[in-house]
From Swiss-Prot:
It comes from Streptococcus pyogenes serotype M3 (strain ATCC BAA-595 / MGAS315). This is Dephospho-CoA kinase. Coiled coil: none annotated. Catalyzes the phosphorylation of the 3'-hydroxyl group of dephosphocoenzyme A to form coenzyme A. It catalyses: 3'-dephospho-CoA + ATP = ADP + CoA + H(+). InterPro entries: Depp_CoAkinase, P-loop_NTPase. Keywords: ATP-binding, Coenzyme A biosynthesis, Cytoplasm, Kinase, Nucleotide-binding, Transferase. Its EC number is 2.7.1.24. The gene is coaE.
Length: 197
């Protein structure tokens, strides 16, 4: 059984993943896969450098993720170019990791922030959505990334609204409350997995 985890930006996916890992389950983290592919010499690093030139690199040749983010979020054409380049490479890498893990794990998870946007729904037997309302999401993103309201709204707008993700979810984990409530919901869902009725 493969379970997809998703949610909006700053919805609390990282906390959910920590609880799942602590319970002994394997989680493929799409953001980490992307990070690795963007390391100097990686497939995405080379593809992005080819598309945008050396202006997206730091003095030491590493990818300047902050500069790249600014370029993408401020220019829809750059975002479209980057997405077209990255999505295929990322999909291939995630598929390889999924197939490898499926050989040894009966149940595992994949944390994919843009799961619905990129059409990964068919990969999963179940999808867990980490949900927060719009106001909570905005406040958490501003605090976490030290962004002003305008920049935070811009980042949120680059994803499918979280309300539109709900119909795809087999489980909605509500993270509008405190940490303890969130953890209890995840533990309860994991218990149901281990002891299906």
């Amino acid at each position: 059984m493969i379970i997809g985890i998703t949610g909006g930006i700053a919805s609390g996916k990282s906390t959910v993943v920590k609880v799942i890992r602590k319970a002994g389950y394997q989680v493929i983290d799409a953001d980490q896969v992307v990070h690795d592919l963007q390391e100097k010499g990686g497939r995405l690093y080379e593809a992005l450098r080819e598309a945008f030139g050396n202006q997206i690199l730091k003095a030491d040749g590493e990818l300047d993720r902050t500069k790249l983010s600014e370029m993408l979020f401020s220019n829809p054409d750059n975002m479209a170019t980057s997405s077209a380049i990255q999505n295929q490479i990322i999909k291939e890498e995630l598929a390889a990791k999924r197939d490898h893990l499926a050989q040894s794990q009966a149940i595992f998870f994949m944390d994919i922030p843009l799961l619905m946007e990129l059409g990964y729904q068919d990969w999963f037997d179940a999808i867990w959505l980490v949900y927060v309302d719009a106001q909570t999401q905005l406040q958490r993103l501003m605090a976490r990334n030290r962004l002003d309201k305008g920049k935070a709204r811009q980042r949120i707008a680059s994803q499918l609204p979280i309300e539109e993700k709900k119909p795809y979810a087999s489980l909605v984990i509500d993270n509008n409350g405190d940490m303890e409530t969130l953890i209890k919901q995840v533990q309860s869902a994991l218990l149901s997995l281990a002891n299906p009725r």
